Amino acid sequence: MEKGRHHVNPRQGRGRGLIGSAMNPESYSTMEQVRAGVDNLDRQIVALLAQRFAHMRAAARIKQDRGAVRDEARKAEVIANAREEAEQLGLPGDVIANLWDQLVEASIGYEMDEFDRTKA
């Protein structure tokens, strides 16, 4: 097997299925299955981030004032929503809130760059 490549159970495939589709980590019996599942989820997360960043491009296009890009009230709301959703799913709220803080900051930076690029 090539370095960095893992055997994938044919029943799991390498497809880009919907989150939660046909993946049951409780049924895994090998680290190959775990790694293939994580790799699949990572691809889905990146695809979702591409959609999120497309929304940031739309926001940059719509906003007329660069100062409107950073909205601390909206940032707090987004992070609180993520924390609440995480806790409802049994995940550690603080960990998810920290991750979302980084995601929102990266999104704001991206939106500012897009604003500058398109409004220059």
Where are the predicted features?
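Domain-level signature for soluble enzymes in the chorismate/prephenate branch of the shikimate pathway
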Residues: 2, 9-120
